Regions:
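A structural motif
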Residues: 24, 93, 97-98, 189, ...
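Acidic/histidine-rich catalytic cores of soluble enzymes
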Residues: 26-27, 123-210
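H/E-rich (His + Asp/Glu) clusters that bind or coordinate divalent metals
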Residues: 215-216, 223, 228-229
Length: 258
């Protein structure tokens, strides 16, 4: 398993500063704006990452908030334009060497049928394949993908040609047991967003020897998972930025003692 952080955890710190100031083995890049897709900027990020020995596993688009409007619209021309727009992401990913594109999808109240959703996802999935990119559906609570039943239907409809990002805090918010999710979808999970929790907060830094993190990692081991697991936290919930890197350290230690 590969462990790292999401640069989103330190938002709004500039991404290049996160990479330059903190040596981590792996990371997920959160693109925050249009100019960060410019080849000159992306090459700069790649150089900084290489100098720090950082492998970029995945990227997360700032347009995830617009995916319902762009990709799951009733206006076909907007959908086609949105598909073309994603080429900018995939070209940037090719420069970075990132292989996994994190996808949220439509909101729960989306206007399209489930089958239409699956077919549109497949268009983006197939475009990603042309660039050597895996478009991976994340289980986001506020989206249709927050439902395991929906994901199961999606996998069946697309004949198993679906990759998933598993986010354990999103599972908590949806009332879904993390262990049950892993057991159900293990063959399709290619990437993980991970955080800890308390009775009072569903997204906290990873505590030393956290029982729930140890259980999750043990289950992932049993299922043969070998992909990435990146710490994804919300900066406004942190007492200090160092909590992100302490979480990574605690995550690695939890894996080693399992």
């Amino acid at each position: 398993m590969q462990f790292g952080i999401s640069t989103a955890s330190l938002y709004p710190m500039l991404t290049e500063e996160v990479l330059a100031e903190h040596a981590v083995p792996c990371c997920e890049i959160f693109f925050n704006t249009l100019s960060e897709l410019a080849p000159s900027y992306v090459r700069k990020l790649k150089k900084i990452a290489d100098q720090g020995g950082i492998q970029i596993l995945s990227t997360h688009p700032f347009t995830c908030a617009f995916e319902p409007f762009m990709l799951f619209t009733g206006y076909d021309r907007r959908f086609q334009d949105a598909i073309e727009w994603h080429k900018y992401y995939f070209e940037a990913m090719n420069i970075l060497g990132a292989k996994i594109f994190v996808f949220h999808g439509d909101r729960k109240q989306g206007i399209l049928s489930e089958h239409a959703y699956f077919e549109r996802f497949a268009v983006l999935r197939d475009l990603g394949k042309r660039f050597g990119i895996t478009v991976a559906q994340e289980n986001v609570e506020r989206c249709r993908s927050g439902s395991p039943d929906f994901l199961e239907k999606m996998i069946r409809y697309l004949n198993g040609d679906v990759a998933l990002v598993f986010d354990n805090k999103q599972a908590r918010r949806a009332g879904v047991d993390a262990i049950a999710f892993v057991r159900q979808f293990a063959p399709y999970i290619c990437h993980i967003h991970i955080s800890d929790c308390t009775d009072n907060c569903d997204c906290t830094p990873i505590a030393p020897h956290s029982p729930q993190i140890c259980l999750l990692l043990n289950e992932l081991k049993k299922m043969g998972y070998e992909g990435g697991a990146v710490v994804e936290l919300y900066r406004n919930l942190l007492q200090k930025d160092e909590d992100v890197f302490l979480s990574l350290q605690n995550l690695v230690e939890a894996y080693c003692i399992n």
